[in-house]
Amino acid sequence: AGTQASAKCCTSDITLAEFRRLKGKMDGVNPNATTPEAYINGTPDWRTDLYASRGTLMTHAESIELFEQLGTKFTPELKSPSVEMPYGGGYTQEDYAQQMIDEYRAAGVDPADVYAQSFNLDDVLYWIENEPAFGEQAVYLDGRYGDESFDHADPSTWDPDMADLADKGVNIIAPPMWMLVSTEGDDMVDISRKSYEFFV
């Protein structure tokens, strides 16, 4: 009693045919649930599931084709694997990072339209080194705010710091919005500008 419900639902051995039989639903859970069915039936009351309970799942390659038709740019995030890497005896993190880029190459997408993203700095550095046309605008999603020694308002705690990242070829860094601005009294303070000035 008093403990919120939680669950982790994933698999590493699903086939493409099995994946295609699934239906997408709006993300949301009921933390007060006592059954699996109630847990996944967690759409907030102010939303509707009328159009969000039978979504057709797509592969990454299929999503590229759709976005090409819609004329959009691409911001794919290489998700952290839920399995130990290398997986299955030989599939490495580098293979995983390369596979994502290969699908854009196979579709003939202009690298300038792709902003590959990852919270794993090594992924971004891999793209910079091995796929420079894509790596030039690869995005480092900065998740270091979870580290105890990291203070987003104190550049002396940043490792690597902005200068180090720039030296490694990282041109775009994306921290959460709350790390970029703060308040002092009634004034909004641009932390990102203050941090930039720290290194100039």
Describe the predicted segments one by one.
Residues 1-125, 129, 133-137, 141-146, ...:
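Metal-dependent phosphodiesterase/phospholipase catalytic core, i.e.
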Residues 94, 135-200:
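C-terminal active-site rim and adjoining tail of enzyme catalytic domains
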